[in-house]
Amino acid sequence: MLPETSLRGRLLAATVVLGLSATGAFAQQEPCIGNSVAVTGPAAFSGLAIKLGAEIAIDEINAAGGVLGKKLKLIQYDDAGAPPRGVDNTRRIALADKCIAVLGGFHSTVALAQVDPIHEIGIPYMGVWAANTKAIENGRDPNFMFRISAKDKWVARFLVDEALKVSKNGKIAFFYENTGWGNGALPDVKSALAAKGKELVAAETFNWNDQDMTPQVIRARDAGADVAIFWAIDREGNQILRSMDKAGWKPTIIGAWGISGNLGELAGPLANGVRVMQTYSFQTEQSATGKKVLAAIEAKTGIKDPRDIKAASGIADAYDAVYLLADAIKIAGAYDWKKVQAALYQVSRDGLVAPYKPAFDKKDPERQDALLPQYYLLTVWHEGKLIPFKGSPYDK
């Protein structure tokens, strides 16, 4: 029988070893990226686009040998646009799958709900679509939430600039959904207009699944607005267009990218001329990387005409997001959440959408966003297709 002191020593040593092993296991994550996006519901097009872009990047990375000698894989979850599901997915990706990072999807309400669990756990998050300003500029230090997508603060300035270019009387109306995304955009739009010495003549909100926007439309029309900015998804964007048609009001419409999915199908000819902010289009002159991604899209989906690609921005942003994460893992030298979070500030590369040099800046809270506003572009709905505005029938 061992002496008590010897037994106690061995138990203590075992405890230390187990503790060290647990720490090492916790630090060393798996070579997977968890994709928590909407692949069902009205924004399913967005999640499918993000999945496609991420898969193309992962295929390329793995064909070149993977990252730190390991092949990456994508683990897919559906948040269906529901914040509780997004939170649950985050915990599963981090604690059950032990992935190195989370990709975030379309809905800002989900991204806002993920802020707490992301930071409680300490897993890097890369937003690929949801544009709410405060989801990423969240005041956390260290901040584990990054984005390669649009940011509403910058989108508001972009859309306000476009609105004032085309307005004949400087009167702008704003239609926004009653969600974290829409409500978060209202102060951004007001601020962008105030910087130009203007203010909204109408700010009209609505809920998901509202069928008739006639009261809101009439108030905006009677306020004299000749341009309407939309912060809506396709479903409600369609209802606003139909209410405008019923009211006999035809303002110029400029929207955030929530109406970039199937508005042309839902609204038919009423969508013609509706302008939409995007971060990428496969219909412009393509770089070598763009041509390579187009070929991969055709191989995976059978789509040959770039005009038939839905949610091009989601595909392109997700593609670049995976490469930024892969670069950070290489710089970190390990599949370790904290090391990868720190390494993201050192990443610099020429991406599909834009050059990221550097991708992020730790000293500037605004630069948790990799994609700068000079790379935003304007597209327009025409005969059921979303095409570049420049050179379109509406570019007069």
Describe every region a protein language model picked out.
Residues A22-G24:
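N-terminal signal peptide c-region/cleavage motif recognized by signal peptidases
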Residues L2-E4, L12-T15, F26-K396:
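Extracytosolic ligand-binding ectodomains
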